[in-house]
Amino acid sequence: MATHPKHIHFIGICGTAMGSTAVALRALGHNVSGSDSQVYPPMSDVLRDAGITVTEGYKPENLPPDADVYVVGNAISRGNAELEALLEKKLPYVSMAEMLKREVIQGKRSFVVSGTHGKTTTTTMLAWIFEHAGKNPGFMIGGVPENFESGARFTHSDLFVIEGDEYDTAYFDKRSKFFHYLPECAIVNNVEFDHADIFDDLDAILLSFRRFLNLVPRNGLVLINGDDPNCLSLREKCPAPLKTVGLGPACDLRIQITAATPESTMFSINGDPFEVPMVGEFNARNAAMCVAAARFAGLSDDEIRAGLVSFRGIRRRQQERGTTNGVTVIDDFGHHPTAIRETLRGLRQRYEGRRLWALFEPRSNTSRRNVLQDELID
C-alpha cells in the first residue's frame, strides 16, 4: 500500500463506492478533493466531516492543477466537462477499481467475494470475522455494515476483503471490476444472468468469472458454491486450488443445517458446528464460505465462531424498520428474482405463521427489462 501522501481528485465523488474510497484514502493521509453533479446528505456530510473539499457541478476549473491523479467514476461518460478537460490536458487518470489496486490492494492478501447474490453480506461477514479476531483488516463493502462505522477502511494489515463486482469498471475500461483486485482467495457465491445492460447472456458472464479465477495464484484458494451448476462449470481449467461449499453430498465442505430459530441458523461443516445470527440456507452458505476463507487466512475455528455469532448484518438486508399496529416493515435491497425468492424464504422462517406482503420496486437496469419478467412473476 502506498505510504507517501498524494493529491487525489475524484470526478463523481458522491457515489457510495467513490465517496467511501475517498474518505478511506483521506484517513490514510492523502489530500482528497472531488466534484459531483449533485451534492447532498448523507454523503455530503460524510465527505465534509472527513475534511474533503467537494464542488457541486462539473466544470473544467474544478480540476486542481496540483493533483497527482484523477479518479473517473463509472457514472462519468464522454461529454462531461471535467472529463473532456482532463483528456485535453493529458492529465493522469484511473478508474476507482484501478486506484484501489494501486494504492490499497497491491502487496496484500486480497479476499475477493463475487457472485450474483450475497456479495455484500459475505464480504462484511468475513471482514468482521477478521476484525473480531484482532486482525484489523482493510475492506471495501458495497453497503452499510452494522458492525463497522463505514463501508470502507484501509489499514496496514496484510488482510484486505473486497466485494468483487462483475459490472464494468469505467467508460474507458469495460472489464469487470473484480479483474483489478488481485485475488489470493476468490469466493464465488453463485452465478446467474444479470446486468443485461452490459452482458449479452449467461455465457458472457461465465466467461468473465472464468477469467477472474484465472488471476488466483497457485498458492491461493478458490471457493465456489457446490450447489450451483453454473459455479460448478467454472471448475474446468481453474489453475488454483478449488473447493466446493454447499449442502450437496458431493461438496468438499458440506453444510448441514442442524437447527434454526427465527433469529439464527445452526449448521455444521463436515461435522464442525457453527452458528450465524441470520436465517435461511442462503445465509448459512454465505457463512460457510467465510469459515473456509478465514481458515485459509490462518484463523482457528474458535476465532471464527466468535466472529460469526457477533455479526450484526447489513442495512437494507432483511432489516426490520419498525412495527405499527401489529404490522412489521422489513427493508431489503434484493432485486434479482433469486434474491427476492431467498429473502422471502428467510422471512417465512423468521416470521413463521404471519402473513407476508411484498412490495417490489424495479430499480436495477436488469429488473426494468423483460429478460427476467417470467421469473419475477413466478
Label each residue range with its predicted role.
Residues 31-36, 138-139, 244:
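Short beta-strand "acidic-cap" motif of Rossmann-like dinucleotide-binding folds
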Residues 168-182, 338-346:
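Switch II of P-loop NTPase G domains
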Residues 9-10, 24, 96-145, 255:
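Walker A (P-loop) phosphate-binding motif
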Residues 154-156:
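Conserved motor-coupling elements within RecA-like helicase/translocase cores
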Residues 41-49, 62-72, 77-95, 101, ...:
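Acidic, Mg2+-coordinating active-site environments of NTP-dependent enzymes
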Residues 159-169, 329-335:
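Switch II (G3) loop of P-loop NTPases
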Residues 54-58, 94:
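Short acidic-hydrophobic, aromatic-tinged amphipathic segments that line or gate anion-handling sites
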Residues 4-22, 31-38, 314, 338-378:
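Active-site beta-alpha connecting loops in nucleotide-dependent enzymes
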